[in-house]
Amino acid sequence: MNLLTFIAPLAVAATFMMPADAANHKELPALGNTHIQVFDKTPVCFRPDSFPNYTPANADGVIRLVNGRIILKKITLPDYKRDVDVTLKVTVASNGDRWDKSGSCFVLPKESVINLMNIAEGKRAFPAVDSTKYEKMIGIVPGQDYVPTLELMRFMTPFGVGYYSSDNDSLSSKRRPVYIPKWEKSVTWVQDITDLYPALEREAYVGIYIDTWTAEGYVASMELDVKESKITCDVMPERRVKPLMNTVYYIGQTYPDIFSRKDVVMDFDMPKAAKNVRLKYIVTGHGGHSGGDEFVEKRNIVSVDGKEVLNFIPWRDDCASFRRFNPATGVWLIPRVAAYIGLSLIHI
């Protein structure tokens, strides 16, 4: 039994490999590279008059949850025998929402009986949590028949990129600083997610959540690129992914402010034979109210079995370099945490 302690809003997963039998050398078939355009400028919005809590797949296979604020789709990948590299690409543009919003690209864990989809359908519910440890923070840690949603990437939407980016826009045309030549039309983030491939292999449900409360919302695109090894004997290692915690409030959950009051502790088991174990940590520093860490330096600490393994302050002082993605906002002069508007959040 291992003990994990956190003091920051986050998504965490453990990835590890199991020992392989090197003696069983053989030539493996090539299945080729795979490119999947999961979403292509798909609206992410808040339209309770059009989308109920659960909207079945449309002609493009897109499922919508929580009144359109989550888009979800089933993907299928070849049954690769050789090792692969996996890259995720997410592109977002405003469709009329001019504000900065938190966003999450995720996959539903296959081993979880309870997930966002059947919760939205009203068929299941998040399991109860120990209120002495987690207060009312349902859905953030594993429970009976439940594994937290596995986050692939987290991001912050820019202020109005795309919708307000034209040269003659009444809002932004007079706000462009002299040091940028133009407003960008969208923002794109790219992330290596090879370690998380086991959650995607064969079939999986992947999605994007944006915390928008407007009918216009955003348009989002998502691409997956899987590159197969060219080495004929490069066998796919036995990787495993274990989602430990996810504090994104996807559906009917509480805003994750528990870290302002206490450290969060959870138990997890690690196989004795596991090798190359990695702790994947994604931190969000957004929300400046009541001592929030958007403009205040807050230390992020992770401990395993009482031993500190991570201690840092997510912080940047080059806000101006992202100004071109934010036509619907004013001048940026103040250093901020990792939640730069138009920046993918810190992945460790």
Identify the role of each PLM range.
Residues 92-96, 282-292:
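Short amphipathic, basic-aromatic surface patches that mediate peripheral association
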Residues 183-248:
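Ser/Thr/Pro-rich, low-complexity mucin-like regions
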Residues 1-27:
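Bacterial Sec-dependent N-terminal signal peptides
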Residues 79-88, 270-280:
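Extended extracellular/luminal ectodomain segments enriched in beta-structured repeat modules
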Residues 98-104, 290-301:
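Short coil-to-beta strand junction motifs in C2/discoidin
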Residues 64-76, 258-269:
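Short beta-strands within extracellular/lumenal beta-sheet-rich domains
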Residues 346-348:
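Conserved small/polar residues in nucleotide/adenosyl-binding loops
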